Amino acid sequence: MDKEKLQQGLNEYEAKVAKAVAKFPERKNFEAQRLYTPLDIEDFDYGEKLGFPGQYPFTRGVQPTMYRGRLWTMRAYAGFATAEETNARYKYLLEAGQTGLSVAMDLPTQIGLDSDHELSHGEVGKVGVAIDSLADMEALFDGIPLDKVSTSMTINGPAAVLLAMYVAVAEKQGVKPDALKGTIQNDILKEYIARGTYIFPPRPSMRLITDTFEYCSKNIPKWNTISVGAYHIREAGASEVQEIAFAFANAMAYIDAAIKAGQKVDDFAPGISWIFTAGLDFFGEVAKFRAARRLWARIMKERYGASVPKAQMLRVHVHTAGSVLTAQQHLNNRSEERRVGKECWRVCMC
């Protein structure tokens, strides 16, 4: 069918179904057409908009075969009570087949308070492990060779301090910093707008983050120096579009600050990683991740002049959306064919 006939047929179709469509409107806050035809992709540039898997603009993934060729790191978010108790849990998880560690810190640790501080009362070891000293960090990873495991630490305000402790524990094990692999969340801007576990004002907090960028790029090249928190913003009430927009704005602020401090984008940007939400909207979530990969690649290349492929990639860790789960329907939360299973499926499909 040529273009004119297709347009004529589309016009006739829309007129015919207008009354039925009016009874079932689309979401007002989300711009999307009900029907797409070849007319919508007349100017579609395959290389620019889609490309090949593992190549710029990474729409189809940052690896050529994605999860069929390389499974994602599997790590349960874990931490509770004392360092010794959490250490036992980590060893159990690793023996059970987990391929990385994800450290949950308690709220006093997240805001830089010792466990015996009066404001810590009732919160010590409650939503994560309590880390007050280097001795606690040594106990947390006792018997776990840090050159053999990738460790993600969900910590923001005192992230630089916890990273320094981790490096010290590794050195005590005889492991050099350049052999370490892992991530610190280290995203303070989303704490101001979505969570609240900040310690210092924005400017000194940003300096700590950019200093961490520089240190890691020179000494711990395999370390992800930040995990930009789109997830927390979404869980605080943002839409799929806002999730990307606000997280990208925060990430660009970090990049601008690092460049202003004299760092080169190709040196520190490969250490930028992300944490996104996987929600229940199948097509919306798949489109979100694919669009975000392409948009971020263009921002890094065109705005910041990044030439190293890893500096252009949107490397993502995903959490399924806790906001869609309900205590009243707990059996619907976890099963493979229901909420969490469906959210995981959406991520695998993008």
Tell where the protein language model's regions lie, with residue ranges.
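Short polar catalytic/cofactor-binding loops
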Residues: L280, C344-W345
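Conserved small/polar residues in nucleotide/adenosyl-binding loops
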Residues: E336-C344
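Short, well-ordered amphipathic alpha-helical segments that serve as non-catalytic structural scaffolds
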Residues: Y254-I255, L295, I299
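Charged, alpha-helix-enriched surfaces in structured cytosolic catalytic cores
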Residues: V161, A291, N333
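RNase H-like, Mg2+-dependent phosphodiesterase core
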Residues: C348
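Extended amphipathic alpha-helical segments enriched in small hydrophobics
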Residues: E285-R293, A297
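Catalytic alpha/beta active-site cores
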Residues: M1-G279, G284-E285, R303-A306, K310-H319
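Flexible, glycine/threonine-enriched loop-and-boundary segments that flank and lead into catalytic domains
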Residues: A297, A321-N333
